Protein backbone atom coordinates (compact mmCIF):
# COMPACT_ATOMS: atom_id res chain seq x y z
CA UNK A 1 0.00 0.00 0.00
CA UNK A 2 1.03 3.63 -0.32
CA UNK A 3 1.20 3.95 3.47
CA UNK A 4 3.55 0.96 3.77
CA UNK A 5 5.70 2.35 0.96
CA UNK A 6 5.89 5.77 2.65
CA UNK A 7 6.86 4.18 5.97
CA UNK A 8 9.61 2.13 4.31
CA UNK A 9 10.92 5.22 2.48
CA UNK A 10 11.25 6.95 5.85
CA UNK A 11 13.24 4.14 7.44
CA UNK A 12 10.41 2.43 9.33
CA UNK A 13 10.78 -1.36 9.49
CA UNK A 14 7.41 -2.83 8.52
CA UNK A 15 8.44 -6.43 9.20
CA UNK A 16 5.57 -8.16 10.93
CA UNK A 17 3.00 -5.65 9.67
CA UNK A 18 -0.51 -7.06 9.23
CA UNK A 19 -3.36 -5.33 7.46
CA UNK A 20 -7.06 -5.49 8.24
CA UNK A 21 -10.13 -4.44 6.26
CA UNK A 22 -11.48 -2.43 9.19
CA UNK A 23 -10.86 1.32 9.28
CA UNK A 24 -7.94 2.78 11.18
CA UNK A 25 -8.70 3.55 14.82
CA UNK A 26 -9.13 7.22 15.62
CA UNK A 27 -8.56 9.20 18.78
CA UNK A 28 -10.19 12.62 18.80
CA UNK A 29 -8.70 14.93 21.43
CA UNK A 30 -10.42 18.13 22.49
CA UNK A 31 -8.47 20.73 24.43
CA UNK A 32 -10.39 23.22 26.59
CA UNK A 33 -9.26 26.87 26.97
CA UNK A 34 -7.62 25.98 30.31
CA UNK A 35 -5.61 23.16 28.68
CA UNK A 36 -7.66 20.19 29.94
CA UNK A 37 -7.97 17.35 27.44
CA UNK A 38 -10.90 15.05 26.72
CA UNK A 39 -10.69 11.97 24.50
CA UNK A 40 -13.10 10.18 22.19
CA UNK A 41 -12.05 6.92 20.56
CA UNK A 42 -13.35 5.06 17.52
CA UNK A 43 -11.75 1.63 17.57
CA UNK A 44 -10.83 -0.05 14.31
CA UNK A 45 -8.28 -2.42 12.80
CA UNK A 46 -5.80 -2.53 15.68
CA UNK A 47 -8.44 -4.08 17.98
CA UNK A 48 -8.51 -7.12 15.66
CA UNK A 49 -4.84 -8.10 16.12
CA UNK A 50 -4.79 -11.75 17.18
CA UNK A 51 -2.11 -13.88 18.88
CA UNK A 52 -1.81 -15.89 15.63
CA UNK A 53 -0.50 -12.75 13.92
CA UNK A 54 2.36 -12.32 16.39
CA UNK A 55 5.56 -13.65 14.83
CA UNK A 56 7.53 -15.17 17.71
CA UNK A 57 10.74 -14.94 15.69
CA UNK A 58 10.19 -11.20 15.26
CA UNK A 59 9.78 -10.83 19.04
CA UNK A 60 12.89 -12.96 19.61
CA UNK A 61 14.99 -10.74 17.32
CA UNK A 62 13.90 -7.50 18.96
CA UNK A 63 15.67 -5.65 21.76
CA UNK A 64 12.60 -3.96 23.24
CA UNK A 65 8.90 -4.72 23.20
CA UNK A 66 6.82 -1.66 24.07
CA UNK A 67 3.06 -1.50 24.41
CA UNK A 68 0.39 0.72 25.89
CA UNK A 69 -2.90 -0.16 27.49
CA UNK A 70 -5.18 0.76 24.58
CA UNK A 71 -4.52 -2.69 23.10
CA UNK A 72 -5.72 -4.21 26.40
CA UNK A 73 -9.22 -2.74 25.99
CA UNK A 74 -10.38 -5.17 23.27
CA UNK A 75 -10.46 -8.94 23.74
CA UNK A 76 -8.55 -9.95 20.60
CA UNK A 77 -5.77 -7.35 20.79
CA UNK A 78 -5.56 -7.91 24.57
CA UNK A 79 -4.72 -11.58 23.98
CA UNK A 80 -2.17 -10.67 21.32
CA UNK A 81 -0.51 -8.04 23.52
CA UNK A 82 -0.18 -10.33 26.54
CA UNK A 83 1.06 -13.17 24.31
CA UNK A 84 3.81 -10.95 22.86
CA UNK A 85 4.75 -9.54 26.28
CA UNK A 86 5.03 -13.04 27.76
CA UNK A 87 7.22 -14.15 24.86
CA UNK A 88 9.49 -11.11 25.18
CA UNK A 89 9.76 -11.52 28.95
CA UNK A 90 10.55 -15.23 28.62
CA UNK A 91 13.36 -14.54 26.14
CA UNK A 92 14.95 -11.78 28.24
CA UNK A 93 13.91 -8.74 26.18
CA UNK A 94 13.20 -5.37 27.75
CA UNK A 95 9.43 -5.13 28.08
CA UNK A 96 8.28 -1.51 28.32
CA UNK A 97 4.69 -0.73 29.35
CA UNK A 98 2.72 2.52 29.38
CA UNK A 99 -0.59 2.00 31.23
CA UNK A 100 -2.12 5.01 29.49
CA UNK A 101 -5.50 5.09 31.26
CA UNK A 102 -8.38 6.49 29.21
CA UNK A 103 -11.68 6.06 31.12
CA UNK A 104 -13.87 6.15 27.99
CA UNK A 105 -12.27 2.93 26.72
CA UNK A 106 -13.34 0.90 29.76
CA UNK A 107 -16.71 -0.12 31.20
CA UNK A 108 -15.57 1.16 34.59
CA UNK A 109 -12.62 1.81 36.87
CA UNK A 110 -12.67 -1.72 38.33
CA UNK A 111 -12.35 -3.35 34.91
CA UNK A 112 -9.53 -0.97 34.00
CA UNK A 113 -7.63 -1.71 37.22
CA UNK A 114 -7.92 -5.46 36.63
CA UNK A 115 -6.52 -5.41 33.10
CA UNK A 116 -3.99 -2.61 33.60
CA UNK A 117 -2.32 -4.61 36.38
CA UNK A 118 -2.03 -7.94 34.53
CA UNK A 119 1.06 -7.06 32.40
CA UNK A 120 3.03 -5.56 35.32
CA UNK A 121 4.98 -8.73 36.28
CA UNK A 122 6.14 -9.02 32.65
CA UNK A 123 7.53 -5.48 32.44
CA UNK A 124 11.10 -4.35 33.06
CA UNK A 125 10.15 -0.70 32.66
CA UNK A 126 6.86 1.10 33.32
CA UNK A 127 6.06 4.77 32.63
CA UNK A 128 2.88 6.27 34.05
CA UNK A 129 1.34 9.54 35.13
CA UNK A 130 0.78 10.53 38.76
CA UNK A 131 -2.95 9.82 38.29
CA UNK A 132 -2.26 6.27 37.07
CA UNK A 133 -0.03 5.27 40.01
CA UNK A 134 -2.92 4.49 42.43
CA UNK A 135 -4.73 2.52 39.70
CA UNK A 136 -1.74 0.18 39.50
CA UNK A 137 -0.62 0.07 43.12
CA UNK A 138 -3.42 1.32 45.37
CA UNK A 139 -1.04 4.01 46.66
CA UNK A 140 -0.83 7.69 45.75
CA UNK A 141 2.59 8.01 47.42
CA UNK A 142 5.44 8.05 44.89
CA UNK A 143 7.92 6.21 47.12
CA UNK A 144 5.47 3.53 48.27
CA UNK A 145 3.76 3.08 44.91
CA UNK A 146 7.05 2.69 43.05
CA UNK A 147 8.30 0.27 45.71
CA UNK A 148 5.23 -1.92 45.15
CA UNK A 149 6.03 -1.99 41.44
CA UNK A 150 9.70 -2.72 42.08
CA UNK A 151 8.66 -5.67 44.27
CA UNK A 152 6.92 -7.10 41.17
CA UNK A 153 10.30 -7.19 39.42
CA UNK A 154 10.08 -3.91 37.50
CA UNK A 155 13.59 -2.45 37.27
CA UNK A 156 12.71 1.08 36.18
CA UNK A 157 9.56 2.88 37.30
CA UNK A 158 8.96 6.39 35.93
CA UNK A 159 6.10 8.64 37.03
CA UNK A 160 5.62 11.79 34.98
CA UNK A 161 4.64 14.86 37.02
CA UNK A 162 3.81 17.44 34.36
CA UNK A 163 5.59 20.74 35.00
CA UNK A 164 7.37 19.19 38.02
CA UNK A 165 9.30 16.78 35.77
CA UNK A 166 9.49 13.06 36.52
CA UNK A 167 10.03 10.78 39.51
CA UNK A 168 11.92 7.52 39.04
CA UNK A 169 12.86 4.37 40.91
CA UNK A 170 15.81 2.46 39.47
CA UNK A 171 17.05 -0.67 41.24
CA UNK A 172 16.19 0.54 44.72
CA UNK A 173 17.19 4.19 44.24
CA UNK A 174 14.72 7.01 43.76
CA UNK A 175 15.05 10.52 42.45
CA UNK A 176 13.32 13.31 40.59
CA UNK A 177 14.33 15.05 37.39
CA UNK A 178 12.94 18.62 37.27
CA UNK A 179 10.90 19.87 34.34
CA UNK A 180 11.88 22.82 32.17
CA UNK A 181 9.70 25.91 32.27
CA UNK A 182 7.99 26.44 28.94
CA UNK A 183 4.72 27.88 27.67
CA UNK A 184 2.80 24.74 26.67
CA UNK A 185 0.16 25.15 23.98
CA UNK A 186 -0.75 21.48 23.57
CA UNK A 187 0.58 18.52 25.56
CA UNK A 188 -0.80 15.79 23.28
CA UNK A 189 1.91 13.23 22.61
CA UNK A 190 4.16 14.57 25.38
CA UNK A 191 4.15 11.26 27.27
CA UNK A 192 4.86 9.28 24.10
CA UNK A 193 7.73 11.59 23.17
CA UNK A 194 9.16 11.36 26.69
CA UNK A 195 9.00 7.57 26.64
CA UNK A 196 10.45 7.29 23.14
CA UNK A 197 13.43 9.41 24.17
CA UNK A 198 13.86 7.38 27.36
CA UNK A 199 13.86 4.08 25.46
CA UNK A 200 16.33 5.47 22.93
CA UNK A 201 18.75 6.40 25.74
Where are these regions (language model features)?
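Conserved N-terminal subdomain of the carbohydrate kinase-like
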Residues: 1-69
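Short, hinge-like loop/turn segments at secondary-structure boundaries
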Residues: 5-9, 32-35, 112-116, 144-146, ...
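Generic detector of well-ordered alpha-helical packing
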Residues: 35, 99-101, 130, 161, ...
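Acidic, amphipathic alpha-helical patches
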Residues: 54-55, 116, 145, 184
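Conserved beta-alpha-beta core of the PfkB/ribokinase-like small-molecule kinase fold
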Residues: 70-148, 164-166
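Conserved phosphate-binding/catalytic region of the ribokinase-like
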Residues: 86-90, 138-201
Amino acid sequence: SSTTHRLTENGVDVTGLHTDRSPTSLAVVSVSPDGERSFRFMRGADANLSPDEIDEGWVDRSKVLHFGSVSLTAGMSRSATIFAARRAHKTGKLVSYDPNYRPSLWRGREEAMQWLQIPLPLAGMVKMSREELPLLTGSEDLERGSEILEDMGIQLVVVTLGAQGAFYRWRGRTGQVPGKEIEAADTNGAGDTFLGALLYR
